[in-house]
Design a protein with these regions (language model features):
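Conserved alpha-helical scaffold segments that buttress catalytic/binding sites
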Residues: 1-87, 93-94, 121-122
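Short active-site-adjacent structural elements
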Residues: 66-69, 99, 109-113
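Short, electropositive alpha-helical surface patch
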Residues: 77-78, 110-127
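Beta-strand segments within the central parallel beta-sheet cores of soluble alpha/beta enzyme folds
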Residues: 56, 101-102
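A short helix->loop->beta-strand "cap" motif at the edges of active sites that frequently abuts
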Residues: 92-100
Length: 129
């Protein structure tokens, strides 16, 4: 499952792209997507999680959707990343039972990356207490 700005380099990631085994779910977002629009679109991710019932959750934690990031033109705040992480963990808890790994992927404004990563980790820690 991927939420990302589209169209954007390298040109892949449209809704129509499903992968060789029909197991790719892209949620493309236009440049300028606001936090509310992003969070509403993210409900599709949460619904797919409920449907799939994963036993393991791997966060590919990219923070280039932050409003201050120079790469993408999405408009999330550090607090929005906390909300996304928390909601994902809440939805997946019955299936994953705490089997969660997070890998840092992107974020190119160092201050925004630090703040967003911290809020993501805050949600992970709270989830595991």
């Amino acid at each position: 499952i991927s939420t990302h700005q589209y169209p954007y380099y390298p040109g892949s990631g449209s809704e129509k792209e499903k992968g060789k085994f029909n197991n790719v779910f892209n949620i493309p977002l236009e440049a300028g997507t606001t936090a509310n629009q992003y969070l509403n679109a993210y409900e599709h991710v949460l619904n797919k999680l409920k449907e799939f019932k994963p036993e393991f959750l791997l966060f590919s934690a990219g923070f280039d959707a932050h409003i201050d990031d120079p790469l993408a033109q999405l408009r999330l705040s550090s607090e929005d990343f906390y909300t996304l992480t928390k909601r994902t963990l809440e939805i997946s808890k019955p299936f994953c039972n705490g089997n969660v790994v997070s890998i840092l992927e992107g974020g190119y404004d160092l201050k925004a990356l630090q703040e967003s990563s911290q809020r993501h980790v805050d949600a992970l820690i709270e989830f595991n207490w």
